[in-house]
UniProtKB/Swiss-Prot annotation:
Protein name: Cytochrome b
Family (UniProt): Belongs to the cytochrome b family.
InterPro entries in alphabetical order: Cyt_b/b6_C, Cyt_b/b6_C_sf, Cyt_b/b6_N, Cytb/b6-like_sf, Cytochrome_b, Cytochrome_b_C_euk/bac, Cytochrome_b_N_euk/bac, Di-haem_cyt_TM
Entry's Gene Ontology cellular component terms: mitochondrial inner membrane; respiratory chain complex III
Gene3D superfamilies: Cytochrome Bc1 Complex, Chain C
Organism (species): Bubalus bubalis
């Protein structure tokens, strides 16, 4: 008699994805982030579901309902802060996952990579709309500023913004629809993640060397299940340290002031995980140009397979490319810092230089370094 996990129609799918899956024997901890993202997504959906049971998406009661969750609901405060800080952990894993893909050349799996980029956009949209829901000052003004960017689109811009708002300003209709979208998108993300995994399992995982590992595979369970559990425990520990000791460390104090359309906060800024893109947006003195740069800063990932000029897949044996990659990481950290600073000298010029460097590194310097490395192989 065959094992039930290999014969049952549903169990068979799970078995082939998580138990008997042949995996490369040399994948490092950088390969943990895929499973961690899955765990965070489930955690965010669960905490979000419990928050939605008590939240009201009405401009008059939204702020109070969040206060009610924190004060009156059993363990409401921990659910709320796990959800808010869980988003930060989600983005840390997401950026590391994308960085891993860039470093080790995983973008050569075209379908997997492209769905990954769509997933990144979907998660960013979800996080943005979630930030609007508590209806504090930063929620309201963040929603106003970011949705207003669409008015830069020629001809249809203004109509588009008013259509998204459901009126002539960010108001009750906007909050209600943002709640609806914030609720449905994580389920769409979960479905996309399954498609992402489906395409990955068509080719099998990449590995640090970038060389085919077909000759040396090991079963996913128990080797990588135990490794993933360790990674998950470490990150859950980090999350709980954040939630229990410094729950507001990454938040904005302005969001503890109820939304007021008549009073603009001195510095409007998004959550830390959007600051790099926000810095790129602000560094261009033209509205449409800024919006295009903002979209392209993420959409540029789609071009990664086209910009790959090296004869080697991974950066493991390419010192010049490695150097440029870490300069890119430092550049993104600089942009993140600039995004949180006021628009004044010297931050403006630093932001502009960092923005130029960002696009220059990806579009020009890294492909050039790859070609130089190709020629060095002939020596």
């Amino acid at each position: 008699m065959t094992n039930i996990r290999k014969s049952h129609p549903l169990m068979k799918i799970l078995n082939n994805a998580f138990i008997d899956l042949p995996a490369p024997s040399n994948i490092s901890s950088w390969w943990n982030f895929g499973s961690l993202l899955g765990i965070w997504l489930i955690l965010q959906i669960l905490t979000g579901l419990f928050l939605a049971m008590h939240y009201t998406s009405d401009t008059t009661t939204a702020f109070s309902s969040v206060a009610h969750i924190c004060r009156d609901v059993n363990y409401g405060w921990i659910i709320r802060y796990m959800h808010a800080n869980g988003a930060s952990m989600f983005f840390i894993c997401l950026y590391m996952h994308v960085g891993r893909g860039m470093y080790y050349g995983s973008y050569t799996f075209l379908e997997t990579w492209n769905i990954g980029v769509i997933l990144l956009f979907a998660v960013m949209a979800t996080a943005f709309m979630g930030y609007v829901l508590p209806w504090g000052q930063m929620s309201f003004w963040g929603a106003t500023v970011i949705t207003n960017l669409l008015s830069a689109i020629p001809y249809i811009g203004t109509s588009l913004v008013e259509w998204i708002w459901g009126g002539f300003s960010v108001d009750k209709a906007t909050l209600t629809r943002f709640f609806a979208f914030h609720f449905i998108l994580p389920f769409i993300i979960a479905a996309l993640a399954m498609v992402h995994l489906l395409f990955l399992h068509e080719t099998g995982s990449n590995n640090p060397t970038g060389i085919s590992s077909d000759t040396d595979k090991i079963p996913f369970h128990p080797y990588y299940t135990i490794k993933d559990i360790l990674g998950a425990l470490l990150l859950i520990l980090a999350l709980m340290l954040l939630v229990l000791f410094a729950p507001d460390l990454l938040g904005d104090p302005d969001n503890y002031t109820p939304a007021n359309p008549l009073n603009t906060p001195p510095h409007i800024k998004p959550e830390w995980y959007f600051l790099f893109a926000y810095a790129i947006l602000r560094s261009i003195p033209n509205k449409l140009g800024g919006v295009l740069a903002l979209v392209l800063s993420i959409l540029i990932l789609i071009l990664m397979p086209l910009l790959h000029t090296s004869k080697q897949r991974s950066m493991m044996f390419r010192p010049f490319s490695q150097c440029l990659f870490w300069i890119l990481v430092a550049n993104l950290l600089t942009l993140t810092w600039i995004g949180g600073q006021p628009v004044e000298h010297p931050y403006i010029i630093i932001g502009q230089l960092a923005s130029i460097t960002y696009f220059l590194l990806i579009l020009v310097l890294m492909p050039t370094a790859s070609m130089i490395e190709n020629n060095l192989l002939k020596w």
